[in-house]
Every structure is written in C-alpha cells, then in structure tokens.
Amino acid sequence: MSRLIEHILRKAKNNKVIKKAYQSTVNSYLNSHIGEITPFNPRSTSFEKRRINLLVPSINQEHLFGGISTAINFFDQLYKYEQDSFRRIITTDAAPNSEDLLKFSGYTHVSSENDVDGNSQIVSFNDRYNKTIPVGKEDIFIATSWWTAYFAQRIVKWQAEFYTQKPKRIIYFIQDFEPGFYSWSSQYSLALSTYLYKGEQIAVFNSSLLKNFFNNHGYKFTEEYYFEPKLNSSLKKHLISFDKMEKKKKILIYGRPSVARNAFALIVESLRIWVWTQPNADQWEVISAGEHHSDVEIGNGVVIKSKGKMSLEDYANELKESALGVSLMISPHPSYPPLEMAHFGILVLTNNYENKNLSELHHNIYSLDNISPDSIAAQLTKLCTEFEGNKKAGDKESMADYLSEGEQFLFIQELSEKLK
C-alpha cells in the first residue's frame, strides 16, 4: 500500500495540470501585505499651533482597559501641562461609535478629510486607504504600539522635510516588548525596528521592570522615563479589609485563550495534573476571568467555569471570595492581575521572566522560574494546603505606592519641557 501511495505522489509531482492547480490555490491565499502598516499618509495644513497627538489603536469600549486606558490617562495628564496646545486622538485600527464617544464628551469627532482647527479632536483613521490626514509643522506625536510608532517615525520625517525644520521628538509609550507578540516574522522585525529608530525618541515605560529589561538588552532612547502600576481607581472602591472578605475554596485564573503570552493552555494543563494530586480537588471551584471561552472539564469532577470579561464590580466580588489565583504573563511586563489578586488577599501563582520577579513586590505572590505543568500543579497544591491550614494566609501587607492616590506620572512636567 505504501509503495502505491509513493507511486501516486511521484506521478502527481510530475503532472503539469496538478502543479498548476496547486500553484493557483497557493497564490489565492498568498498574503503579501502587512495590515498593521497600511500607509498613514500626511498632508500639509495651514494650522500652525502646537498640537499633541495620541496615536492609539482604538478608544472603543471593548478595548478601553489595560494598556489603552493607561495611555489615555497619560495623555490627559500631559495635556494639563500643555494648556496652550491643542490635542487630538487619532485611532488607527477601529472607529468609535456614538456610545464609545460618550466617554470623550470634551472632544469633537471629525473626519480626516476635513482640515478643522478646533481643539480636542478625535479622528478615526482606520479606513485610510488612499486617504490623508492633516499634519502641521507643530504637531507632536505619542505612539502607543509598535505600528503607531512606525507611523510616527515616518510622519516626523515627512514633517521635517515638508516644513524645512528639525524633526520633532516622538514620545514612545512602551508597555511591553512587542516583538514577542509574534513568532520570528515580518511583524517581529518591524516591531523591533521601532526601538532602533535613529531620530529623537522619548521612551515612557510601564514599570521600572520593563525599563530595566530594555536597558539590559541594549536598547537606547533620547530620554527615558518610567511609571509604576497603580490599582485601578474604580476597582479600588471595592477593596475592603481582609477581615471582611469571605474567602472560599476558589481558584481564580486569568484566562485569555486568544492572548498567547497569558499561556491559557499551560494553565489548563497544569490544572489537569492538579485535580489528581490535590486530595479534595472536587471541593474547590475554578473560575476563569478575562475572556469568554467554553467551560473546560479538567477531570476528577472539576470544571473550569468561564466568567469572561467581567464588570469591575463582579470581578471585585470574585477577588474577595477567591483564595488562590493563577495568572501568567510570558513577557517582561509585570501584568496587572497578579498585583490586583495579591492586594485582595489572594495567594497568586505567576511566572518570572528574565529580570521580572513579582514575588519581590508582594508576599502573596509566588513567582516560578519553571512553569511546566508539573511545577505549577505542585506549587498550587502547596498553596491549597497553606490556605486550608490558615484561612488568613493572604492577609499580608500591601504595596503603599500601588494603593496611593498620588500622581502616577511624576516626570510629566519635565517631559513636557523636553518637547519644547
């Protein structure tokens, strides 16, 4: 039988008709474009006032959390020191609808085709094929992702050439090592190239851990600043003293199957081992929060129940009730869920990554070098035993700066001066 199959394959390889059909099929699926860098073409304008531009993928409600929310907060804080300037938010990947714009009541939504001088504008530029956007001689750009940095770097080059002036400084708001979002590929190389830009670029890092990672790898910027994470102000309203929390035999996992760096499959495989090593696994409830997915049966009568993307109030209630947490982030960014869980009295399992070790930040965090399923399952069993022996095991001192109401971007006035 195997010889017959080999004979058929040899004949097929030499058949011109089959070859042509195969090539036609391959070509029909061939993608020679990189969607993220769809040309972002500027055009000249008579507008000469200083204007701060935030380049952000989206401001839609479904995206307005985590990194984008932090970037907009930074933009708002910077504008407090730029009162003589105009401001503009440019969305590159998605257009907001009327409901999305309710959170931006101080802004006017304008078309890129209109050259409007008004202040506080939102311009949707996701549908930009064969379109241009007005860029003046005093426009300054803040990039929030590798592709928006790619755009900004090209824009300031055009701006300098067209208006015959020195290239403007770019602010690069860096919240992770973004080449790591891709396998070795075109996108990997493009993301990396934005850190190697030869022009003047001010880096603002989300955490000293991330800044140190970049420094350790030899990436250099004109100026460098960093800020440390703080507990979400809305979530903080639900934070109560540990004594008032009713901790249950509940494990809360940060489950985002579509985000590779959160290692959802690895967490599930670890739990499949844990259910057979934990003597009373069927007494524990396992909840997944972050992104909706089907419930997952992991054996021994235990099911991972998906709660998806929860409201802050519902998420806070899960934090108050859960005894243990598992949240992985295969990147140098510290990640918010482990810190949130720890401050709500949860014993949290996470991972180290190069210079990142979150166990140094809070005693409720257990950060592993080896995150094989066996290693995670073994540590989870230890934490179950610790909680069952002491229901107050998670009652540990908080990070004062993380909970403080103080200014997050302490450097922002100095940065504003560097732009002038």
Question: Predicted regions span which residues?
Answer:
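Conserved catalytic-core segment of nucleotide-activated headgroup transferases in glycan assembly
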Residues: 67-70, 89-91, 188, 197, ...
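Conserved active-site histidine-acidic residue motif and adjacent donor-binding/catalytic loop
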Residues: 125-129, 292, 303-319, 334
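Membrane-proximal helix-turn-helix segments that form the acceptor-binding/catalytic region
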Residues: 130-137, 185-203
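Acidic donor-binding loop of glycosyltransferase active sites
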Residues: 139, 320-333
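A charged, aromatic-enriched C-terminal amphipathic alpha-helix characteristic of glycosyltransferases
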Residues: 371, 385-420
